[in-house]
Amino acid sequence: MHKYHLNSPYLPKGDQPKAISELVYGVNQGKQYQTLLGATGTGKTFTIANVIEQTGRPTLVLAHNKTLAAQLCNELREFFPKNAVEYFISYYDYYQPEAYVPVSDTYIAKTSSVNEEIDMLRHSATRSLFERRDVIVVASISCIYGLGIPSEYLKASVKFQLGNDINVRESLRELVSNQYVRNDVDISRGNFRIKGDVLEIGPAYEDRLVRIELFGDEVEAIRYVDPITGEILENLNSINIYPAKHFVTPKDRLLIAIQSIQKELKDQLDFFNQEGKLLEAQRLEQRTKYDIEMLKEVGYCNGVENYARHLSGRDQGTPPECLIDYFPEDWLLVVDESHVTCSQLQAMYNGDQSRKKVLIDHGFRLPSAADNRPLKSDEFWSKAKQTVFISATPGDWECEVSTDGIVEQVIRPTGVLDPVVEVRPTAGQIDDLLDEIRKRVIKKERVLITTLTKRMAEDLSDYLSENRVKVRYLHSEIHSIERIEIIQDLRVGEYDVLVGVNLLREGLDLPEVSLVVILDADKEGFLRAKRSLIQTIGRAARHVDGFALLYADNLTESMSTAIQETERRRAIQQAYNQKHGIIPKPAGKKPSNSILSFLELSRKLQNEGDNADLVSITSKAVDSLNQSEDLGIAFVELPEIIDKLEGKMNLAAEELDFEQAAKLRDRIRQLRKKLSKPE
């Protein structure tokens, strides 16, 4: 049996041993909810890693965004190099859901772009859950969406055992039914080929090939081989080849599903005709009958997920099976930054249903399409038997359900104290801010600035840039992978200041940041609530000289609470340091590029040639034209960038995405202006 082996040069320090002991005891005693109330930089991830090792449970770590999930996955992979630490997020690089706008009679078809590498990591996660117990899956909130039927996925796997006889034709037929594609020329993930007595398969969950060597019908050898060099990497006694897609429907169930779809179609057509909705009836009949024919002929159709209830044999209103259902009964849930993540669960379901209702009412989809949905909040929590919430500022609900299971962790192993907090008036704040930034730049330290609006962030970034400050603006339109690159660039000193709105709060591990600035700190609201302020102040808590500067003309209740909590923690930390003779020292984390290497982006960009250029160049141009000099876009590259952007603009127009096309047009105009003003 596989066991967890925690790899760390450090032993638990400060109040980590007490927190670990209490959480492990709670899990072993069967407590349903516990909360780790840990200040920023106190090593909450290390504490949880110890809890996972000591309890030995398969664990789902839930994060509220892809960036944080990637960071957590990196840290846990370093702690558990010999165990299965998997990454499970949405595999869409781009996703436009199907929608209908009745006011303008506009139908928007679903369009998406799947990231093959992330799809591979998702398959790797489910494979690990079937084959071992020492599994940690770090997932975003997308894990609450339907993911096939675990039992059918497992049943459909094709097993090869050394020395066994196989029916080669039947094995090939099974691979095809599991949505593998035969390709005797180019073997890659999701493909297979057979030449003589050698069968090679590109599993959906591996970047290695599986080679099955036969002697007649007998399996003579099973090997992992390098897809490029053909080098033998590992010899195996047996292997399961899992389906290339998570949604697997056996033929007998497919026939039953088609009959069920036809019955629902008849009922809905009768309803529309009775209501006098002849256009809706005609639209629904035409679309659904076409989908049924596709299902009969090839077992698949566009938008097949809308028939998920029929294909899985579920009753109306019952929850879909998702990643959670791939875990064994005694799994453990860890919710990171729980004050944000928990509230997301309900929002996901509500947003999905409002869009689906419009499609159903206007005859674009059958009513059963509404059951292709994420889990409701109560459905999710009914599946989670034991949960540990992690947050520096847990929400009211987490505290309420963890009545006898709240564990506080305030002491940092490095001895670093919470930041000093100072409130200054807004008069002359920009000049004062510029002075503070220059002090940090001289010492090669970094600065985070949070504003209330996007416009304020843009204007401030422009002003700082004009004053020769190396600054970058982080905004919501930047893709999650590029966000990781931006944060990485801040750490290594490509620029000194990062400006944002609400993207600078949770889970950003930035030991180089010594100053956090909060503008308009007295403007009450979500972005200036007590939890948001505590989280933002905490971004400077990893630096020995951490300092939080709040510009405000009034002291609000939220500000007062945040300052008092920071001072309370600081006092506890100072007392502990004095008692044990600890001198604060900076965190030893290197600004490595491990997140990016984990996602294998560099390899992907190198291999994709022109497409990679399009991604890497145009993403910079589209997202940050006003700062193109800071991004290293050379003047000689501008014509090529403009050409590629025009291609993207035309593509967006062809897909009727006129809003995106207009944005690209405006950005092309800006680039042309830059082109007309040579350096």
Curated annotation (Swiss-Prot):
A GO cellular component annotation in the UniProt record: cytoplasm
Keywords: ATP-binding, Cytoplasm, DNA damage, DNA excision, DNA repair, Excision nuclease, Helicase, Hydrolase, Nucleotide-binding, SOS response
GO BP, one annotated term: nucleotide-excision repair
Helicase ATP-binding domain ranges (all copies): 25-176
Function according to Swiss-Prot or TrEMBL: The UvrABC repair system catalyzes the recognition and processing of DNA lesions. A damage recognition complex composed of 2 UvrA and 2 UvrB subunits scans DNA for abnormalities. Upon binding of the UvrA(2)B(2) complex to a putative damaged site, the DNA wraps around one UvrB monomer. DNA wrap is dependent on ATP binding by UvrB and probably causes local melting of the DNA helix, facilitating insertion of UvrB beta-hairpin between the DNA strands. Then UvrB probes one DNA strand for the presence of a lesion.
Iron among keywords: no
Family the entry assigns: Belongs to the UvrB family.
Species this protein is from: Prochlorococcus marinus (strain MIT 9211)
Pfam families membership: Helicase_C (PF00271), ResIII (PF04851), UVR (PF02151), UvrB (PF12344), UvrB_inter (PF17757)
Main location: cytoplasm
Ranges of residues in domain Helicase C-terminal: 429-591
Name of the protein in question: UvrABC system protein B
InterPro entries in the record: Helicase/UvrB_N, Helicase_ATP-bd, Helicase_C-like, P-loop_NTPase, UVR_dom, UVR_dom_sf, UvrB, UvrB_inter
Domain UVR: 639-674
Molecular function terms, GO-annotated: ATP binding; ATP hydrolysis activity; DNA binding; excinuclease ABC activity; helicase activity
